[in-house]
Amino acid sequence: MRLSSLLALLRPALPLILGLSLGCSLSLLRVSWIQGEGEDPCVEAVGERGGPQNPDSRARLDQSDEDFKPRIVPYYRDPNKPYKKVLRTRYIQTELGSRERLLVAVLTSRATLSTLAVAVNRTVAHHFPRLLYFTGQRGARAPAGMQVVSHGDERPAWLMSETLRHLHTHFGADYDWFFIMQDDTYVQAPRLAALAGHLSINQDLYLGRAEEFIGAGEQARYCHGGFGYLLSRSLLLRLRPHLDGCRGDILSARPDEWLGRCLIDSLGVGCVSQHQGQQYRSFELAKNRDPEKEGSSAFLSAFAVHPVSEGTLMYRLHKRFSALELERAYSEIEQLQAQIRNLTVLTPEGEAGLSWPVGLPAPFTPHSRFEVLGWDYFTEQHTFSCADGAPKCPLQGASRADVGDALETALEQLNRRYQPRLRFQKQRLLNGYRRFDPARGMEYTLDLLLECVTQRGHRRALARRVSLLRPLSRVEILPMPYVTEATRVQLVLPLLVAEAAAAPAFLEAFAANVLEPREHALLTLLLVYGPREGGRGAPDPFLGVKAAAAELERRYPGTRLAWLAVRAEAPSQVRLMDVVSKKHPVDTLFFLTTVWTRPGPEVLNRCRMNAISGWQAFFPVHFQEFNPALSPQRSPPGPPGAGPDPPSPPGADPSRGAPIGGRFDRQASAEGCFYNADYLAARARLAGELAGQEEEEALEGLEVMDVFLRFSGLHLFRAVEPGLVQKFSLRDCSPRLSEELYHRCRLSNLEGLGGRAQLAMALFEQEQANST
């Protein structure tokens, strides 16, 4: 009885018990097999990965690991086989197979290329990664900033067929969506980009304003070309083999109808106006209709507006839609700010934790006195925080425009808040303060003297303080021209008679850093003679320099060091550069250097990457070592309060003892990298603005960097260069220099003597010597 009841209880668990027993038995049996075949090297390898091993085999493995010696298989390339270079893509995006979202193709013609097509380019080009214009005109001249593709045949079907073929061949692997439109269409670019971002790319989609064919069925629809249409990449890939057949079989006077029939006949795909909950909305603009007075929902929500008869109408439509987008953005900001205010009450800090402006980060909180952000004081004409350390300098350029914009915004906000009861007019700026907060943006505090006018015409002067904030916007990647490190660099070394003794050391460093590693660089020596030097019967002061250059040419066959002789009473850097510029092509990359500079491969590569033709000039800031007499190799610590020791030169070798300190010399601008074409353009602009005697006087007070800064529209990139380390030397400050250049030269010499600790110690030792 008990046995039957026990079996009844165990009957549900019998399969589990039998399965566990069978599994354990098979596992034990497998372990015995593995232990019996321990001599098999394959089994030993399996045991190393985690299988059980016996002690003897493990001991043998440990012993073999100690005696293991790797066998190095050398690689020998067969000289009979052609060498195949590994092709690396220019961008990692290409290697990963990533694609851009949207490409826009605009169909234009000979009559509208310079009018409507230009208007389209100015209104939507900055919203899309690529915008192409296709025309049947042969040899069409492209307006500035536009990429035009000419097919040479203006027949509608031919133009559409060649456009699709071009898109497939050149951009089929780079974009997910292709939007085709006419040049008489205005497109709301942000909405179109958002639409493409919401659609799935793994589908055959033909999206636009669906129209019926004449005499065709209800299912056969094409997308009207006047309102534009989207083609998916997969559909374009499927359509490509059928283009030639459609061009011969389908006759149509309109390119959009031809494309619609080709898609239906070859692939069975028709146009749709709605897909995945996204509807393509368009608006047909009536003739002589004013966009400012149009307020229908169809117009306000449209992706495309057609037809646009002239360029001015295109700009008016763009103004109208931009204002609508701006109002919508302001409305969303106000709603978000209201939600933040409501939620802030529920936080532990309460309303005290609400920052101004609402929704932006709180001001930066300094943790020590070294992190306190200072305010810069300014007026409408001057600023009292200058880059060169001067106490006062004129407010000009971008800073003046920034202050003017802040004043206009302050007055506009005051009038918007108090109108129509009060109206304010600015009389003058009493005080202005601004600072840059890295957590928020640029902050302004303005003390304004205002004239207040009431509705009854009463006037009164008021002084009010206004606080403004220009917040940091979204970080954007600016497109830059592509540059490489394969560009040849032409070094230019102006040499005065006083610098001739240091030239052989420069040439030896040039040979070791440039000629030995076979850098793609050349050197031109510009020998500057004085009015009474190097004449007939007089010794040549540059004889040693010429001999050293000839010796380098002998040591390095194929190397040619060119030199030019110039006679000048007061050598100007710009005049010397004029001489060199005429001897080289316009695409030459110049590296203007000094006899104390030691350029190396890294410096030359940064010169190649930072100097961009037609875009940017690069003027590095070199590291100047201090006077060894004041900054010995192992200088003792300075007196209390003298400040920290000066920094060591970049790249110093600590094994050679404590290096001499130094600083980055911001006052010097003798080194520079720029293209000859950019220099010639800036020089021509200087000659056009300054003529005659005024130009001659200006050249005496200008350096090459000043020419680019004042007479060129290029970006001027000025940054520290750790690879340019110069030994201490006192610059020859000629009294013929302009007042500004002479001041900069003297300041560079004084600041280059030593750091605060070294100068304080030198004064202390001098006082001790005088007292004894």
Swiss-Prot record:
Its EC number is 2.4.1.226. One of its GO terms (cellular component) is membrane. Residues 634-652 have a biased composition (Pro residues). Ubiquitous. Highly expressed in placenta, small intestine and pancreas. GO terms for molecular function: glucuronosyl-N-acetylgalactosaminyl-proteoglycan 4-beta-N-acetylgalactosaminyltransferase activity; N-acetylgalactosaminyl-proteoglycan 3-beta-glucuronosyltransferase activity. InterPro entries: Chond_GalNAc, CS_glycosyltransferase. The chain crosses the membrane at residues 7-29. This is Chondroitin sulfate glucuronyltransferase. Residues 1-6 are cytoplasmic. Its main location: Golgi. Residues 30-772 are lumenal. It is an enzyme of class 2 (transferase). Pfam families: CHGN. Keywords: Glycoprotein, Golgi apparatus, Membrane, Signal-anchor, Transferase, Transmembrane, Transmembrane helix. It catalyses: 3-O-(beta-D-GalNAc-(1->4)-beta-D-GlcA-(1->3)-beta-D-Gal-(1->3)-beta-D-Gal-(1->4)-beta-D-Xyl)-L-seryl-[protein] + UDP-alpha-D-glucuronate = 3-O-(beta-D-GlcA-(1->3)-beta-D-GalNAc-(1->4)-beta-D-GlcA-(1->3)-beta-D-Gal-(1->3)-beta-D-Gal-(1->4)-beta-D-Xyl)-L-seryl-[protein] + UDP + H(+); 3-O-{[beta-D-GalNAc-(1->4)-beta-D-GlcA-(1->3)](n)-beta-D-GalNAc-(1->4)-beta-D-GlcA-(1->3)-beta-D-Gal-(1->3)-beta-D-Gal-(1->4)-beta-D-Xyl}-L-seryl-[protein] + UDP-alpha-D-glucuronate = 3-O-{beta-D-GlcA-(1->3)-[beta-D-GalNAc-(1->4)-beta-D-GlcA-(1->3)](n)-beta-D-GalNAc-(1->4)-beta-D-GlcA-(1->3)-beta-D-Gal-(1->3)-beta-D-Gal-(1->4)-beta-D-Xyl}-L-seryl-[protein] + UDP + H(+). The keyword Transmembrane applies. It comes from Homo sapiens. Glycans are attached at residues 121, 342. Belongs to the chondroitin N-acetylgalactosaminyltransferase family. It is a single-pass type II membrane protein. Residues 629-662 are annotated as: Disordered. Transfers glucuronic acid (GlcUA) from UDP-GlcUA to N-acetylgalactosamine residues on the non-reducing end of the elongating chondroitin polymer. Has no N-acetylgalactosaminyltransferase activity.
